[in-house]
Amino acid sequence: MLLNHKVLIPAVAGLMLAGAAQAQLLPTWETNVTLTQQDLDMIHAVVTNQVHGKPVGTRVTWSNPASGNSGYVKLNKKLVKNGQQCESIGYTVRSKGPPVYTEHYYFTSCLQPDGTWKIV
């Protein structure tokens, strides 16, 4: 059984962008969108397998029929920061409602020497 819980988006982004053992602490703030663990797993898979390393403008949608939540992830820009390959990625998450909430977040992550991505 999946348990719904209030998720703090920066922590979600840390889980999405960092390897499982590489989770990082980030500043936190509340969100109106409640995501399930299955939602988080879908977002992580999209970022890891279909967004990182792809051309700028790549936009991949995700939808979880079990929770009713959906959204998309978009690679907005590639850049070099302190000699590291980095990507600016936008996240849009939409709740099943009612009411329906849509929230947008933007993070820059950089490729680490060990092959993981870390939010900077």
Task: Indicate where each model-derived feature is located.
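Bacterial N-terminal signal peptides that target proteins for export
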Residues: 1-9
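Bacterial N-terminal signal peptides
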Residues: 9-18
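Extended interaction-bearing regions that mediate binding to partners or small molecules
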Residues: 24-120
